[in-house]
Design a protein with these regions (language model features):
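Short aromatic/hydrophobic "clamp" motif used to bind/position activated sugar donors
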Residues: 75
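N-proximal low-complexity "stem/linker" segments adjacent to membrane-targeting elements
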Residues: 1-24
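Acidic helix N-cap motif at the loop->helix transition within catalytic regions
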Residues: 16, 38-47, 87
Length: 88
């Protein structure tokens, strides 16, 4: 099982594409939203991700929090402005 973890804040313009790029790869997609004031969470949920809301402290804490929700044997971190390519 593969868990894809995405840390995000105010990324409504890119989060949907990031999630779509891993939909066929991931068994679960978890987005940690660090307090967005835009529609990042709603877009992520509609794209199929589980959204965890948490006030942003720092990048490392957000990643560690995301890992506590993951159930996969493998964890893949993807930044919200990145895309997994088909060759991945």
């Amino acid at each position: 099982m593969i868990s894809v973890l995405i840390i995000s804040k105010n990324d409504e313009d890119v989060i949907g594409d990031a999630i779509k790029s891993v939909n066929d790869l991931a068994d679960e997609i978890i987005v940690v939203d660090g307090g967005s004031s835009d529609k990042t969470s709603e877009i992520a949920e509609k794209a199929g991700a589980r959204v965890v809301k948490n006030k942003f402290k720092n990048f490392a804490d957000q990643r560690n929090l995301a890992a506590t929700f993951a159930h996969g044997d493998w964890i893949f971190y993807l930044d919200s402005d990145e895309r997994a390519t088909p060759r991945f």
